[in-house]
Amino acid sequence: MMNKPQGYICASKDEHDHCVMELIDRQDGFCVGRLDKNTTGFLLISNDASLQKKLLHPLYHVEKTYYVETLKPLQHHLIDAFNQGIIIDQKIQCLPAVLSFIDDYHCYVTIYEGKYHQIKKMFLSCQNQVVKLHRVSFAGVELDSSLHEGEYRHLSQEEFQKMKDQYSF
């Protein structure tokens, strides 16, 4: 588990950008899913291709929860809209998502798929804009709050078992 910092891309090498793999000691791992360059938070890095395939397969609807800060105040009707599934890019129906308000500009969003820039596009479809996006949990495991940006640690046996149990691997 890594607390991905802003400004890094989810790749092993890139000529133009810093890569998260530069931050870890081992180079035999790869990112399980992606967070865009400006998104921070929980990034799973593994050397188990089978695990990666299962966690990313659309069949499993792996849960991902994000802390979101928006440009405009949040509207309460968005809770129902997210529960029904937002249409992004004028034609792509997202699976239902859970939106939980913190205050007028901050919320948590839980999604069960991983379309390209999905949460940002969901808010754009609702005439709002994401100004900060931070993944707080992945596959039922919460980001270790003691990890500073750029730091990582191995999953505990309990965390790994929780993922396996939740998604029947």
Features from the language model and the residues they span:
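RNA pseudouridine synthases
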Residues: 1-169
